[in-house]
């Protein structure tokens, strides 16, 4: 059956995702940056309170995936911490200046990761040649690739996603579709034979604060509503899981 990974920007969200039936959590912070490395405190709390597999992302900053020496050292230190805390996996990706997989650095990352299941994240979608990148990641023995099919959302990238699935039918990384995967379109990914789906399955919830200071923001973008935040919607996760069960080949023949 197709698995559902839920992208969570807090431990609260991870707990909601687990209760709603998610198969796995990708733990991040920094939603506006597309996901950054969670704090040590968040990692510790997730290990203590979430029982399904949690894969923290290791991404020291927003923007591209070509990192300075300091960035890369920080990434390796973070991966070692995640490994030592006993997480199931880690989500990471590094490119070189020409938009190819940075093989020397990825080999170092694989070595530091030890027994962690490594997901190569959507840095894959920024690669020059996805099929070459796929072969390189297979050589590295990464567990899975999170990808939108090199498009702004995974529905637009279905053609490449199908090619990637076909190329890994017998061996190689699991292809996990992500970016714009929703309850309303997930059947398309199931029908395409994609084994894992990645979704934030979220909604915006209002702040619990009653007093709200006007005219002052903490964000450089003063138009951002800082009295609301994004959170996993447990009902959506439950509905997505139900559809995955009904849409599985086994369910269709019972």
UniProtKB/Swiss-Prot annotation:
GO terms for molecular function: copper ion binding. InterPro entries: CutC-like (IPR005627), CutC-like_dom_sf (IPR036822). It holds the Pfam family CutC. It is found in: Cytoplasm. SUPFAM superfamilies: CutC-like (SSF110395). Keywords: Cytoplasm. It comes from the Bacteria. One of its GO terms (cellular component) is cytoplasm. NCBIfam families: PRK11572.1 (NF008603). Belongs to the CutC family. PANTHER family: COPPER HOMEOSTASIS PROTEIN CUTC, COPPER HOMEOSTASIS PROTEIN CUTC HOMOLOG. This is PF03932 family protein CutC. It comes from Yersinia pseudotuberculosis serotype IB (strain PB1/+).
């Amino acid at each position: 059956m197709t698995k559902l990974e839920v992208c969570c920007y807090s431990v609260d969200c991870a707990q909601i995702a687990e209760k709603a039936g998610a198969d796995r959590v990708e733990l991040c912070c920094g939603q506006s940056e597309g996901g950054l490395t969670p704090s040590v405190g968040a990692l510790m709390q997730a290990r203590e309170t979430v029982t399904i597999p949690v894969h923290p992302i290791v991404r020291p900053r927003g923007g591209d995936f070509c990192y300075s020496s300091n960035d890369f050292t920080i990434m390796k230190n973070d991966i070692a911490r995640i490994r030592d805390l006993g997480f199931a996996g880690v989500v990471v990706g590094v490119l070189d200046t020409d938009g190819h997989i940075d093989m020397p650095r990825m080999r170092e990352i694989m070595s530091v990761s030890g027994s962690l299941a490594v997901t190569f994240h959507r840095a894959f979608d920024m690669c020059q040649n996805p099929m070459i990148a796929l072969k390189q990641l297979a050589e590295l023995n990464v567990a899975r690739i999170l990808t939108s099919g090199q498009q702004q959302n995974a529905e637009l990238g279905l053609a490449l996603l199908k090619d990637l699935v076909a190329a890994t039918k017998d061996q190689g990384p699991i292809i996990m579709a992500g970016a714009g995967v929703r309850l309303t379109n997930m059947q398309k990914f199931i029908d395409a034979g994609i084994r894992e789906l990645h979704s934030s399955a979220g909604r915006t919830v209002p702040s619990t604060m009653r007093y709200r200071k006007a005219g002052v923001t903490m964000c450089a973008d003063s138009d951002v509503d800082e009295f609301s935040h994004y959170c996993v919607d447990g009902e959506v996760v439950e509905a997505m899981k139900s559809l995955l069960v009904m849409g599985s080949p086994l369910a269709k023949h019972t």
